Amino acid sequence: MDYNQVFYQIYPLGFCDAPRQNDGILVPRIRKVLDWIPHLQKLGITAVYFGPVFDSDAHGYDTRDYAAIDCRLGSNQDFADVADALHDAGIKVVLDGVFNHVGRGFFAFRDVQEKKWDSVYSDWFCIDYGNTNTRDGFGYEDWEGHPELVKLNLDNEAVCRYLLERIDTWIAEFGIDGLRLDVAYCLNRNFMRMLRSHVKAIDPDFFLLGEMVGGNYRDLCNDEMLDSVTNYECRKGLYSSMNTSNLFEIGYSLNRQFGPDPWDVYTGLHLLSFADNHDVDRLASVLNDPRDLPLVYALMFAM
């Protein structure tokens, strides 16, 4: 696998100026990406990481249908055309894999709302029929206190099999080259092992990136689970070093992670370096001096 890639992140619903709530109207907004391909090539981009593209209630991380592109972005064919054009330009396509939770509009959860414990999908979620603070008649686990994000039960083999089958269709229909696993830090680790084995059997170079904010990156970035994780530690050091006119923090982090000593913690790992993303403030907003913007990117590319 070639880890020497330059990623460009696109949050499609924002990039394409789609409505914040799903209005059910199909508009091929995702085709806007086609006009940007020459710009991506000029920048030297080799891979595009797309935020959520599948049908959702609102922001994309509340998935309703893993098989259909969100109508606010267009049709499956529209996205296939974008993926084909990127591939023709020598640019890989990586999708956001949102597997920890779904939206309340997800078909299986709606079935549970209707049939309660009689639903064949009751075990797809972590449900408590004796405790509820909702109008559903039952309580359920969500992601970090957000009830619109219903936690999937990844201990359930049927759920895992369903998700792997959806990934198979993404590979077949769009030719995707990898996945970025949303909130990988709280994903079921047996599921990630199963996922790795499944996709690597299809394509040994299929790329698995995990979102990991803190903790020991080796817990997820290893030969059993993921190829890479997000390097939040160095992201902080990049802008802090500029704001203090002192490169000690980023230098300390890099030496701690990849220095020459045997106790350096991440020697041999391939971590994703980044300056900002959709979960944090824009780099230009956190820098005290906007003239430091190109310097941060120069430093990041030299890491």
Show which residues each predicted segment covers.
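Substrate-binding/active-site clefts of carbohydrate-active enzymes
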Residues: 1-6, 11-46, 53-169, 173, ...
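Hydrophobic faces of well-ordered beta-strands that scaffold small-molecule active sites
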Residues: 6-9, 48-50, 93-95, 179, ...
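Active-site beta-loop-alpha junctions enriched in small/polar residues
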Residues: 13, 53, 98-100, 184-186, ...
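Short catalytic-loop micro-motif centered on adjacent basic/acidic residues
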Residues: 94, 178-184, 283-284
